[in-house]
A protein has these predicted regions:
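Alpha-helical substrate-recognition element adjacent to the catalytic core
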Residues: 2-113, 117-118
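Short, acidic/turn-prone active-site loops that include or flank metal/cofactor-
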Residues: 113-116, 171-175, 189-191
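Alpha-helical segments flanking ligand/cofactor-binding loops in enzyme cores
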Residues: 78, 138, 157-158
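Short acidic-hydrophobic, aromatic-tinged amphipathic segments that line or gate anion-handling sites
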Residues: 128, 182-191
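Substrate-recognition "cap/lid" segment bordering the active-site pocket of phosphatases
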Residues: 95-147
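Short amphipathic alpha-helix with an adjacent loop that forms part of the alpha/beta core around
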Residues: 194-201
């Protein structure tokens, strides 16, 4: 039995931190896991910038409310779910993701949680498990699922490489050049076709 595991930001919705960097006028916050493979280091750096500028959860949530899904993302998910179980696996946080899940038709999402002070300052974060994407696909495999995975960033490579089939989607030129063995696609139609084909192969 197959289950498809998808990254969220950059695949189905725009990058939240890039949108917030633009809304807040803080260009440093545009750095994502496409640029920095160490997520823990990236998040601590982000929290330092938020503190420095006196910004907290409320300001980020106001930006998230205005973000829409990427064109075609909802239709892609709806079509994919007609022939495969689907789980979205993201390093984002429940507190950011909820409004976006509504726009995607409430798919199943595995993500993380923030530690927030009474005044709204984000003081820390709690990762569900170490290497959550890779750990999740391995856990699914341990209970009898064949996994198919797709994402755009460094932190997706573990689940992509550990799955029966894995694909890069709208990734960077550098990641595609560094991992030429991983098929890379730019459109939802191509990705749907690749997932279907992988499920047909014994």
């Amino acid at each position: 039995m197959y289950i498809t595991c998808l990254d969220v930001e950059g695949v189905l919705v725009p990058e939240i931190w890039i949108a917030f960097a633009e809304a807040s006028g803080i260009p440093e916050l545009k750095k994502t896991t496409r640029d920095e493979p160490d997520y823990d280091k990236l998040m601590r750096w982000r929290l330092g910038i938020l503190k420095e500028h006196g910004l907290g959860l409320k300001e980020i949530q106001a930006t998230v409310e205005k973000i829409d899904r990427l064109p075609g993302a909802r239709e892609f998910l709806d079509e994919l779910r007609t022939f495969s179980q689907v789980i979205l696996i993201s390093d984002t946080f429940t507190e950011f993701a909820a409004p976006l899940m509504k726009k995607l038709g409430y798919p199943t999402l595995f993500c993380n949680s923030l530690e927030v002070a009474d005044d709204g300052e984000i003081t820390g974060f709690k990762m569900r498990v170490e290497q959550s994407k890779l750990t999740t696909v391995k856990a699914l495999q341990s209970i009898g699922f064949e996994t198919i995975a797709s994402g755009d960033s460094y932190n997706d490579l573990g689940m992509i490489q550990a799955s029966k089939a894995g694909f890069l989607f709208r990734s960077t030129d550098k990641i595609k050049a560094d991992y030429p063995q991983i098929p890379a696609y730019e459109t939802y139609e191509e990705l749907l076709g690749a997932i279907k084909k992988a499920m047909e192969e014994k």
